[in-house]
């Protein structure tokens, strides 16, 4: 795994949101252990999730968010993706920047 997360925590966090529309990002961040990580580790996680290295996490990358933690994880539903984006995108540009991502995890 990345950002120093424990495999058992990742497995438990993924299991908790395996059903469609059960993903709640704040619960996931806490369960997977990201919420308690240093800002450095949180930023490392951001750069993994930002797959096209644009400096932003776009909606299509958010949809595949869980697959960064396990290749067999499901894609997020449209409703989950939009809720995740709405909470993280504070400046309304339709993307989540690294500072927005860190603020969301540390909230």
Curated annotation (Swiss-Prot):
Listed A to Z, the keywords are:
Acetylation, Calcium, Metal-binding, Muscle protein, Repeat
The residues that the entry says bind Ca(2+) 2 are: 89, 91, 93, 95, 100
- Additional information: This is one of two major parvalbumins found in the white muscle of pike. This parvalbumin has an isoelectric point of 4.10.
What range(s) does the EF-hand domain occupy? 37-72, 76-107
User: Which Pfam families does this one have?
Assistant: EF-hand_7
Q: Which family does it belong to?
A: Belongs to the parvalbumin family.
General function of this protein: In muscle, parvalbumin is thought to be involved in relaxation after contraction. It binds two calcium ions.
- Which of this chain's residues are annotated to bind Ca(2+) 1? 50, 52, 54, 56, 58, 61
SMART domains found in the cross-reference section: EFh
The UniProt entry's GO CC annotations, sorted and at most eight, read: axon; axon terminus; cytoplasm; dendrite
Task: Spell out the PANTHER family in the cross-references.
Answer: PARVALBUMIN (PTHR11653:SF12), PARVALBUMIN ALPHA (PTHR11653)
Classification via InterPro entries = EF-hand-dom_pair, EF_Hand_1_Ca_BS, EF_hand_dom, Parvalbumin
Q: Which residues carry this modification: N-acetylserine?
A: 1
- Protein name in UniProt: Parvalbumin beta
The UniProt GO MF terms for this protein read: calcium ion binding
């Amino acid at each position: 795994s990345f950002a120093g997360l424990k495999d058992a925590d990742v497995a438990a966090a993924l299991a908790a949101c395996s059903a469609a529309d059960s993903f709640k990002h704040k619960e996931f961040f806490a369960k997977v252990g990201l919420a308690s990580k240093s800002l450095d580790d949180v930023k490392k996680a951001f750069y993994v999730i930002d797959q096209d290295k644009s400096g932003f996490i776009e909606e299509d990358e958010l949809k595949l968010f869980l697959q960064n933690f396990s290749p067999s994880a499901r894609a997020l539903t449209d409703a989950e993706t939009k809720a995740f984006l709405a909470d993280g995108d504070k400046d309304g540009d339709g993307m989540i920047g690294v500072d927005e991502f860190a603020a969301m995890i540390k909230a």
